[in-house]
Amino acid sequence: MVDLNCDMGEGFGIYSFADDEEIMPFIDAANVACGFHASDPNTMRKTVELAKKYNVKVGSHPAYPDLVGFGRRPMKMKREEIKNLVMYQTGAIKAFLDEFDMPLNHIKPHGSLYGVSAKEEDVANGIADAAEIFNVGIFGMVNTFHEKVYKERGVKFYGEFYSDLEYDETGYLVIAKGRNQYYPTDRAVERCMRAMKENKVQTIQGNDVDVGCETICVHSDTPNAIEILKALREYISPKKNSSEKSTNGNHSKMPYIIAVSYTHLRAHETD
Protein backbone atom coordinates (compact mmCIF):
# COMPACT_ATOMS: atom_id res chain seq x y z
CA MET A 1 0.00 0.00 0.00
CA VAL A 2 1.28 3.44 -0.90
CA ASP A 3 0.43 6.58 1.06
CA LEU A 4 1.05 10.11 -0.15
CA ASN A 5 1.40 12.85 2.47
CA CYS A 6 1.25 16.65 2.19
CA ASP A 7 1.60 19.69 4.46
CA MET A 8 -1.69 21.57 4.10
CA GLY A 9 -3.92 24.29 5.47
CA GLU A 10 -1.09 26.81 5.69
CA GLY A 11 -3.05 29.91 4.78
CA PHE A 12 -4.93 31.95 7.38
CA GLY A 13 -7.60 34.61 7.39
CA ILE A 14 -7.91 36.10 3.90
CA TYR A 15 -4.47 34.81 2.91
CA SER A 16 -3.98 31.60 0.97
CA PHE A 17 -0.73 29.66 0.64
CA ALA A 18 -1.39 27.06 -2.04
CA ASP A 19 -4.26 25.33 -3.79
CA ASP A 20 -4.88 22.46 -1.38
CA GLU A 21 -7.70 21.03 -3.45
CA GLU A 22 -5.50 20.81 -6.55
CA ILE A 23 -3.04 18.53 -4.79
CA MET A 24 -5.43 16.70 -2.45
CA PRO A 25 -6.61 14.14 -5.07
CA PHE A 26 -3.02 12.89 -5.42
CA ILE A 27 -2.39 12.24 -1.74
CA ASP A 28 -3.43 9.82 0.97
CA ALA A 29 -2.39 11.76 4.07
CA ALA A 30 -2.25 15.46 4.94
CA ASN A 31 -0.17 17.16 7.64
CA VAL A 32 -2.44 19.99 8.70
CA ALA A 33 -1.03 23.21 10.16
CA CYS A 34 -2.34 23.86 13.66
CA GLY A 35 -2.20 27.63 14.01
CA PHE A 36 1.30 28.30 15.35
CA HIS A 37 3.16 28.81 12.07
CA ALA A 38 0.10 29.11 9.83
CA SER A 39 -3.63 28.36 9.68
CA ASP A 40 -6.54 29.34 11.90
CA PRO A 41 -9.64 27.52 13.17
CA ASN A 42 -11.64 28.12 9.99
CA THR A 43 -8.77 26.98 7.76
CA MET A 44 -8.16 23.92 9.92
CA ARG A 45 -11.79 22.86 9.72
CA LYS A 46 -11.95 23.49 5.97
CA THR A 47 -8.79 21.44 5.40
CA VAL A 48 -10.07 18.51 7.45
CA GLU A 49 -13.37 18.65 5.59
CA LEU A 50 -11.49 18.66 2.29
CA ALA A 51 -9.42 15.68 3.43
CA LYS A 52 -12.58 13.75 4.21
CA LYS A 53 -13.97 14.59 0.77
CA TYR A 54 -10.92 13.03 -0.89
CA ASN A 55 -10.53 10.16 1.59
CA VAL A 56 -7.23 11.56 2.86
CA LYS A 57 -5.83 10.68 6.28
CA VAL A 58 -4.85 13.58 8.53
CA GLY A 59 -1.90 14.18 10.82
CA SER A 60 -0.91 17.25 12.81
CA HIS A 61 1.82 19.62 11.62
CA PRO A 62 2.91 21.38 14.83
CA ALA A 63 5.48 24.17 14.91
CA TYR A 64 7.19 26.66 17.16
CA PRO A 65 4.89 29.63 17.94
CA ASP A 66 6.22 31.74 15.08
CA LEU A 67 3.40 32.94 12.84
CA VAL A 68 5.38 35.89 11.49
CA GLY A 69 8.38 33.71 10.63
CA PHE A 70 6.30 30.77 9.37
CA GLY A 71 7.85 28.51 11.99
CA ARG A 72 11.30 28.86 10.48
CA ARG A 73 13.00 30.36 13.53
CA PRO A 74 14.22 28.00 16.25
CA MET A 75 13.31 28.66 19.87
CA LYS A 76 14.96 27.42 23.04
CA MET A 77 12.42 25.28 24.90
CA LYS A 78 12.59 22.58 27.53
CA ARG A 79 11.41 19.04 26.83
CA GLU A 80 8.16 19.52 28.75
CA GLU A 81 7.46 22.73 26.86
CA ILE A 82 7.94 20.93 23.54
CA LYS A 83 5.59 18.17 24.67
CA ASN A 84 2.93 20.69 25.67
CA LEU A 85 3.44 22.65 22.45
CA VAL A 86 2.88 19.57 20.30
CA MET A 87 -0.01 18.29 22.42
CA TYR A 88 -1.78 21.66 22.25
CA GLN A 89 -1.59 21.88 18.47
CA THR A 90 -2.31 18.22 17.85
CA GLY A 91 -5.27 18.37 20.21
CA ALA A 92 -6.66 21.28 18.21
CA ILE A 93 -6.59 19.42 14.91
CA LYS A 94 -7.94 16.29 16.60
CA ALA A 95 -11.01 18.25 17.70
CA PHE A 96 -11.88 18.91 14.06
CA LEU A 97 -11.13 15.30 13.17
CA ASP A 98 -13.54 14.19 15.88
CA GLU A 99 -16.23 16.35 14.32
CA PHE A 100 -15.82 14.52 11.01
CA ASP A 101 -15.37 11.12 12.67
CA MET A 102 -11.80 10.80 11.41
CA PRO A 103 -8.81 9.42 13.36
CA LEU A 104 -5.53 11.22 13.93
CA ASN A 105 -3.03 9.42 11.72
CA HIS A 106 0.42 10.81 12.63
CA ILE A 107 2.51 13.82 13.65
CA LYS A 108 4.98 15.62 11.40
CA PRO A 109 6.85 18.54 13.01
CA HIS A 110 7.12 21.66 10.89
CA GLY A 111 10.09 23.79 9.92
CA SER A 112 12.59 24.56 12.65
CA LEU A 113 10.85 22.20 15.06
CA TYR A 114 11.55 19.42 12.56
CA GLY A 115 15.14 20.55 12.13
CA VAL A 116 15.99 21.18 15.77
CA SER A 117 14.46 17.86 16.85
CA ALA A 118 16.74 16.10 14.36
CA LYS A 119 19.77 17.53 16.18
CA GLU A 120 18.66 17.86 19.81
CA GLU A 121 17.65 14.78 21.76
CA ASP A 122 15.51 16.60 24.33
CA VAL A 123 13.41 18.19 21.59
CA ALA A 124 12.94 14.85 19.85
CA ASN A 125 11.92 13.33 23.18
CA GLY A 126 9.40 16.11 23.76
CA ILE A 127 7.74 15.33 20.43
CA ALA A 128 7.80 11.62 21.22
CA ASP A 129 6.19 12.33 24.61
CA ALA A 130 3.24 13.89 22.79
CA ALA A 131 3.09 11.17 20.14
CA GLU A 132 2.81 8.55 22.86
CA ILE A 133 -0.19 10.35 24.34
CA PHE A 134 -1.97 10.28 20.97
CA ASN A 135 -0.61 6.82 20.09
CA VAL A 136 0.53 7.82 16.59
CA GLY A 137 3.76 7.69 14.58
CA ILE A 138 6.07 10.51 13.51
CA PHE A 139 7.64 11.50 10.19
CA GLY A 140 11.34 12.40 10.29
CA MET A 141 14.89 11.97 9.01
CA VAL A 142 17.01 8.83 9.38
CA ASN A 143 20.40 8.94 11.09
CA THR A 144 19.24 11.77 13.35
CA PHE A 145 17.63 11.95 16.77
CA HIS A 146 14.31 11.47 14.97
CA GLU A 147 15.17 7.88 14.20
CA LYS A 148 17.21 7.20 17.34
CA VAL A 149 14.70 8.53 19.86
CA TYR A 150 11.48 7.37 18.22
CA LYS A 151 12.70 3.83 17.56
CA GLU A 152 14.25 3.45 21.02
CA ARG A 153 10.95 4.48 22.58
CA GLY A 154 8.81 2.28 20.36
CA VAL A 155 7.14 5.20 18.58
CA LYS A 156 6.42 4.39 14.94
CA PHE A 157 8.98 6.20 12.79
CA TYR A 158 8.63 6.97 9.08
CA GLY A 159 11.92 7.85 7.38
CA GLU A 160 11.36 10.75 4.98
CA PHE A 161 13.09 11.53 1.67
CA TYR A 162 12.83 14.88 -0.12
CA SER A 163 12.49 14.70 -3.89
CA ASP A 164 13.08 18.38 -4.63
CA LEU A 165 15.74 19.34 -2.08
CA GLU A 166 19.45 18.63 -2.11
CA TYR A 167 21.38 16.95 0.71
CA ASP A 168 24.77 17.86 2.16
CA GLU A 169 27.53 15.44 3.11
CA THR A 170 26.16 15.10 6.64
CA GLY A 171 22.78 13.93 5.36
CA TYR A 172 20.93 17.14 6.21
CA LEU A 173 18.77 19.11 3.81
CA VAL A 174 20.17 22.12 1.98
CA ILE A 175 17.79 25.05 1.62
CA ALA A 176 18.91 28.08 -0.38
CA LYS A 177 17.36 31.52 -0.10
CA GLY A 178 14.35 31.99 -2.36
CA ARG A 179 13.60 28.28 -2.44
CA ASN A 180 10.50 28.43 -4.64
CA GLN A 181 12.44 27.19 -7.64
CA TYR A 182 11.72 24.77 -10.44
CA TYR A 183 13.23 21.34 -9.78
CA PRO A 184 13.67 19.12 -12.87
CA THR A 185 11.01 16.43 -12.83
CA ASP A 186 13.28 13.77 -14.32
CA ARG A 187 15.92 14.42 -11.68
CA ALA A 188 13.36 14.34 -8.88
CA VAL A 189 12.03 10.99 -10.08
CA GLU A 190 15.52 9.56 -10.62
CA ARG A 191 16.58 10.51 -7.10
CA CYS A 192 13.43 8.99 -5.62
CA MET A 193 13.88 5.74 -7.52
CA ARG A 194 17.45 5.42 -6.27
CA ALA A 195 16.43 6.29 -2.72
CA MET A 196 13.76 3.61 -2.80
CA LYS A 197 16.02 0.93 -4.26
CA GLU A 198 19.31 1.73 -2.50
CA ASN A 199 18.43 4.15 0.33
CA LYS A 200 21.12 6.46 -1.06
CA VAL A 201 21.27 9.98 -2.48
CA GLN A 202 24.13 11.94 -4.00
CA THR A 203 25.00 15.05 -2.01
CA ILE A 204 25.98 18.49 -3.30
CA GLN A 205 29.59 17.52 -2.53
CA GLY A 206 29.29 14.48 -4.81
CA ASN A 207 29.40 11.70 -2.23
CA ASP A 208 26.55 9.37 -1.32
CA VAL A 209 24.72 9.38 2.02
CA ASP A 210 22.13 7.04 3.46
CA VAL A 211 18.52 8.21 3.42
CA GLY A 212 15.18 6.90 4.55
CA CYS A 213 12.51 6.42 1.95
CA GLU A 214 9.32 5.26 3.60
CA THR A 215 7.92 8.67 2.75
CA ILE A 216 8.83 10.92 -0.18
CA CYS A 217 8.24 14.63 0.20
CA VAL A 218 7.35 16.95 -2.69
CA HIS A 219 6.94 20.62 -1.80
CA SER A 220 3.84 22.33 -3.12
CA ASP A 221 5.72 25.59 -3.62
CA THR A 222 7.96 23.91 -6.17
CA PRO A 223 6.45 25.35 -9.38
CA ASN A 224 6.21 21.94 -11.07
CA ALA A 225 5.04 20.06 -7.97
CA ILE A 226 2.01 18.57 -9.74
CA GLU A 227 4.21 17.37 -12.61
CA ILE A 228 6.56 15.68 -10.16
CA LEU A 229 3.66 14.09 -8.31
CA LYS A 230 2.12 12.68 -11.46
CA ALA A 231 5.45 11.24 -12.55
CA LEU A 232 6.10 9.66 -9.16
CA ARG A 233 2.62 8.17 -9.10
CA GLU A 234 3.30 6.45 -12.40
CA TYR A 235 6.46 4.87 -11.03
CA ILE A 236 5.26 4.01 -7.57
CA SER A 237 1.56 3.42 -7.11
CA PRO A 238 -1.86 4.86 -7.83
CA LYS A 239 -3.78 6.37 -4.95
CA LYS A 240 -6.26 4.05 -3.31
CA ASN A 241 -9.81 4.56 -4.56
CA SER A 242 -8.47 6.94 -7.21
CA SER A 243 -9.08 7.10 -10.93
CA GLU A 244 -5.34 7.76 -11.31
CA LYS A 245 -3.95 4.39 -12.40
CA SER A 246 -0.32 3.40 -12.79
CA THR A 247 0.83 2.04 -16.13
CA ASN A 248 3.72 0.26 -14.44
CA GLY A 249 2.06 -2.70 -12.83
CA ASN A 250 5.04 -4.06 -10.94
CA HIS A 251 5.69 -0.74 -9.24
CA SER A 252 2.15 -0.49 -7.88
CA LYS A 253 2.99 -2.94 -5.10
CA MET A 254 6.02 -1.04 -3.79
CA PRO A 255 5.47 -0.22 -0.09
CA TYR A 256 6.31 3.48 -0.02
CA ILE A 257 4.69 6.73 0.99
CA ILE A 258 4.91 9.86 -1.15
CA ALA A 259 4.89 12.98 0.96
CA VAL A 260 3.96 16.32 -0.54
CA SER A 261 4.96 19.23 1.64
CA TYR A 262 3.70 22.79 1.67
CA THR A 263 6.77 23.85 3.62
CA HIS A 264 10.38 24.33 2.63
CA LEU A 265 11.96 24.22 6.05
CA ARG A 266 14.88 22.21 7.08
CA ALA A 267 17.03 20.34 9.50
CA HIS A 268 20.11 22.18 8.21
CA GLU A 269 20.26 25.97 8.10
CA THR A 270 22.22 27.40 5.17
CA ASP A 271 21.70 31.13 5.70
Residues of each region from the PLM?
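Conserved, mostly hydrophobic/aromatic
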Residues: D7, H61, I107, V218
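A short alpha/beta connector and helix-capping loop motif
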Residues: F12-M44
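Acidic (Asp/Glu)-rich catalytic clusters
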Residues: E22-P25, T47-K57
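Glycine/small-residue-rich loop that forms an oxyanion/phosphate-binding "nest" at active or ligand-binding sites
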Residues: V68-E99
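Catalytic beta/alpha-barrel core
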Residues: V136-V142
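Active-site rim beta-loop-alpha module in soluble metabolic enzymes
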Residues: F145, V149, F157-M196, K200
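C-terminal helical cap(s) of enzyme catalytic domains, especially alpha/beta-barrels
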Residues: A225-S237
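Conserved small/polar residues in nucleotide/adenosyl-binding loops
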Residues: T263-T270
